[in-house]
Amino acid sequence: MKKIILTIATAALISVNVFAADGGKKANETALNISYSVQQAFNADFSDATSVVWTVTKNVQKVDFVTFGTKKTAFYNLSGEFLGVTQYVDYNAIPAKSQKLIEEQYKGYKVGSVIVYQTNEALNNDIDQTTYFVDLKNTDHEVLVRITNSGKAEFFKQVK
């Protein structure tokens, strides 16, 4: 389960252009593939959502949407249980302690996007309830760094 959630967070970070890429066309095309229980859960969890676009994989049902002007992505397992939600945030949203660690450990890297992932702790309490993923780039490499609840900056994945 932890691996699925971390994969979800990574996929969300890498798919920066998901809203622009499909122009919202998938909303009606894939709606029939979304399980009824997931649609009901999503409507209850995010009743004010607009610009809803669903994607189904073999492990999860993902929905990109806008709520109160903020783009978010929610993830549900195939049984309809809410796994978590991601959204892009400003770099200043992560703790100052973490920013300092990133500056020390990743000199020469520039901050790209930052995603906050808020998990359904009731479903899996082995994972931090709130985790930040910071995309860092230099001329040769791109890495994802995970910021834990305790403020630790940990290498998560080599992107390039």
Describe each model-derived feature in a short phrase.
Residues 1-25, 42:
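Bacterial Sec-dependent N-terminal signal peptides
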Residues 22-160:
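Interaction-mediating elements
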